[in-house]
Amino acid sequence: MAYRKRGARREANINNNDRMQEKDDEKQDQNNRIQLSDKVLSKKEEVVTDSQEEIKIADEVKKSTKEESKQLLEVLKTKEEHQKEIQYEILQKTIPTFEPKESILKKLEDIKPEQAKKQTKLFRIFEPRQLPIYRANGEKELRNRWYWKLKKDTLPDGDYDVREYFLNLYDQVLTEMPDYLLLKDMAVENKNSRDAGKVVDSETASICDAIFQDEETEGAVRRFIAEMRQRVQADRNVVNYPSILHPIDYAFNEYFLQHQLVEPLNNDIIFNYIPERIRNDVNYILNMDRNLPSTARYIRPNLLQDRLNLHDNFESLWDTITTSNYILARSVVPDLKELVSTEAQIQKMSQDLQLEALTIQSETQFLTGINSQAANDCFKTLIAAMLSQRTMSLDFVTTNYMSLISGMWLLTVVPNDMFIRESLVACQLAIVNTIIYPAFGMQRMHYRNGDPQTPFQIAEQQIQNFQVANWLHFVNNNQFRQVVIDGVLNQVLNDNIRNGHVINQLMEALMQLSRQQFPTMPVDYKRSIQRGILLLSNRLGQLVDLTRLLAYNYETLMACVTMNMQHVQTLTTEKLQLTSVTSLCMLIGNATVIPRPQTLFHYYNVNVNFHSNYNERINDAVAIITAANRLNLYQKKMKAIVEDFLKRLHIFDVARVPDDQMYRLRDRLRLLPVEVRRLDIFNLILMNMDQIERASDKIAQGVIIAYRDMQLERDEMYGYVNIARNLDGFQQINLEELMRTGDYAQITNMLLNNQPVALVGALPFVTDSSVISLIAKLDATVFAQIVKLRKVDTLKPILYKINSDSNDFYLVANYDWVPTSTTKVYKQVPQQFDFRNSMHMLTSNLTFTVYSDLLAFVSADTVEPINAVAFDNMRIMNEL
């Protein structure tokens, strides 16, 4: 045996040799205990086996039945010093373990509504920049000129399509698009103001500062800057702020101001924000002890139901999202309190079993795995799995009849769909062949794998006993009822389970089974089954209460679920040991546990935040897909767009999602309509593409190709360069048209006739690489002939900056030499900065306060748990 007698009274005739042997045994046991505690604390798993010496001693003990029964009773006493050893050594393999995966829980809880981020600056694509002016002879003048340039000119070098730049720009706008703007929060002091006036944001202030200090600024402009300040209209709760913005940026910010998502907030809205079932639950006392100011605002969460139907044909994604929901749900299911003492319960069970030597092997297993940790774990697993609709699998030992009888309670209260079919069939088959069929003397059921009927469905047709057949009928038809509550699809338990009446039905069936003769089985077998049933039936009242408690906690937490509870079996399962179900049935006390209001609010907030973020990311992805389609980038960017969408949901491991699900997700996203604000923003970008291209230093509007040398020309912004500002006199061919048709005969003929040709269309403008090679990479079939006929190395566009302080190029002393190029880049002039045209007044509310956590205003408490009532206005736990 693994446990030895210590300090037990010996018979009076024990000799000295026995006493010496006893001392040696005590020392050996002490060493074993020290080693055992080390093993328990270590994470290394090892199989616990008896040593040869202990086996020999056990053989000797078996010689006397009296000694054997004493040995057994000593184990069952489970004194305090033995308790941990028993739980961790004998029962270690039967206790279910759960790793909380805190990283996933943290990811879920860290998803905050992005709307609440505070805007400190206006949205801008452009910024004014000073550029030098070059004289006709190429020298740089001392004076400067202001132009609007792109703030983030992020066009990468190399093979890059300008249309991709606009797609990335749109993505950037969607990321930065504020859901509300409060100008008062971002306003800063105007340093050059006479009366400490304020301008709309820090960038406007820095632009004003730079212009004020520029020597060429007119006096009238300086005087205007000194007068720039906010204008308050207190009666209308409105304030106007001066701003310096490019007209396109002004259009963006004006649109954001006109389409803010904030709505007035009052007590009624907060009250209605609380799930209705929690508001109406008499166990929770909710109070709002403050009135909100009239300037209170909130952003309504976007709680549209799942438009992608992730449960339908997205096995990997569905598994991930249900796992995350399961981990979150486990963290909020309350812990059981005041469970029956494990020691006392095992003692009582051993008395009920009237354990004797003959029944040691079968009936001592009944006590295996019974401990409070397993009971609590089972309670949490059942509720969390139902809340997240995670499929469960059952682990059990067929010879442990107590586990199977507990499994009958489990199958009674939990719908069949919650278990993976193979596991459900195995458990039902074990119950049928171990308990039900032997009771009536029926032959073993030989179940064929793949049979559409479950063992219980087959048994229901063959069992003549009304009570047993009635119970089997209930289990076979135990399904969730789908009920839409507050627009959310809920999976609701059967009313007979919610009020606990089904347990009486189960007990009637068990009593009928225990009264049967088991004609084909030995007497010991019949007695073992009867005693197992007796153990469970002795706790009828507690089982009714447990069932009501389980249903109440499930439905209360379910009120905080905001996404439709779709029931689809998951790829992976949550393991449930039937020994832990036995622990729950045997150790449940009479203490009611219900979720604390703070826990409910936390669970509700996390669900709302994830759901709202999910919908916003869908809207972003749909908008980007539509934009890619309209920019003719549909095929090129599609998978990257879907991957980006999944990454922004935080919980998915994108690299492991199969490609077929990625493309299915793309197809679903493609069918959804674009949200209005996002569509308007894209149209704003489309209308102003030309202005944005002009402001970039890396985008040109075309390229001129010639066979003969073309002289460099003076440009006011760059000096002597091969940049053309107009296309007068050149034959023009549309670059997009050329790429689409693939007809390049026209361009080839022109070049062979030494006629310069201008290919017009946006293209990357990189000064140190070949324009032709860049174009050729866009479509090799179109430009292959051109590249083959010409020396590509001679076609590099050259950017000559000729002035005294330039390191780029120095003129040689040969005045007959004229720098030339065989290509010119066609680049339109960016918009010149005009202070008067850039001055805009922006209007917003003078002040309002946005509240993100609405439930912070609600103070909540519960009634004394002992008084908590279920849906039928009866106490949840009646057995006191």
Swiss-Prot record:
Residues 1-80 are annotated as: 5-fold hub. The keyword Transmembrane does not apply. Residues 1-38 are annotated as: Disordered. Residues 19-30 have a biased composition (Basic and acidic residues). One of its GO terms (molecular function) is RNA binding. GO terms for cellular component: T=2 icosahedral viral capsid; viral inner capsid; viral nucleocapsid. Pfam families: Rota_VP2 (PF05087). It comes from the Viruses. Keywords: Capsid protein, Inner capsid protein, Repeat, RNA-binding, T=2 icosahedral capsid protein, Ubl conjugation, Virion. The record marks 220, 224, 228, 839, 841 as: Interaction with the intermediate capsid protein VP6. The keyword Chloroplast does not apply. InterPro entries: Rotavirus_VP2. It is found in: Virion. Its main location: virion. Residues 394-414, 422-442 are annotated as: Hydrophobic. Sumoylated with SUMO1 and SUMO2. Sumoylation of viral proteins seems to have a positive role on viral replication. Inner capsid protein that self-assembles to form an icosahedral capsid with a T=2 symmetry, which consists of 120 copies of VP2, with channels at each of its five-fold vertices. This capsid constitutes the innermost concentric layer of the viral mature particle. It encapsidates the polymerase VP1, the capping enzyme VP3 and the genomic dsRNA, thereby defining the core. The N-terminus binds RNA. It is necessary for encapsidation of VP1 and VP3. The N-termini of 10 VP2 molecules form a cylindrical hub underneath each 5-fold axis of the inner capsid. Belongs to the rotavirus VP2 family. Homodecamer; each decamer is made up of two conformers of VP2, called VP2A and VP2B. Interacts with a VP1-VP3 complex. Interacts with the intermediate capsid protein VP6. Interacts with NSP5. Interacts (via N-terminus) with NSP2. This is Inner capsid protein VP2. It comes from Rotavirus A (strain RVA/Cow/United States/NCDV-Lincoln/1969/G6P6[1]) (RV-A).
